[in-house]
Amino acid sequence: MSVAQAAEIYDVRAHLFGLAGRLAASRVTLRDVAELGGMVAEMGEAKDIDSYYPLNVAFHARLVELSGNSRVAELYYALGKELHLFRRRGLVGGGAIVLSNQEHLRIVEALRDHNGDLTERTMTDHILAGKTRLLERVKGQGPEVSEPGLRTSKENE
């Protein structure tokens, strides 16, 4: 998959995640919000990508699950699997883990307030910020961006 193809998938995934947030905002309980807050705190203690990334994946999965919409969840997970290596790469360096987790905290706050509009916007923006972090990370890296199954758009030509 090329970086350009991954960027397109990020766009679709962002809006699915936003929809999941809108749906979850009307359904979450105080217990759900506390659980999500605990997950954010645990991610805040992660010292590196190897400890942060699985927690991040679990947090996103829980958010999508809280939407109550199995089709949104199915599509979101499928897109996430396609982007696995890109998502991980986008969280490496430049304070990306800290920024990502600050965005997670804003998502939890919007859910706590049951604000569907804000939750949708915050969750969409979170994925788009991840896309931006990835694109900044791979900019100018050329062939070394490639990992098994990943190619830059120039390599696809």
Specify the residue positions occupied by each region the protein language model found.
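Short linear motifs at protein or domain termini
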Residues: 1-26, 65, 135-157
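Conserved amphipathic alpha-helical segments that form helical-bundle/coiled-coil interaction surfaces
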Residues: 12-19, 27-89, 100-110, 118-129
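C-terminal regulatory/effector modules of DNA-binding transcriptional regulators
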Residues: 96-157
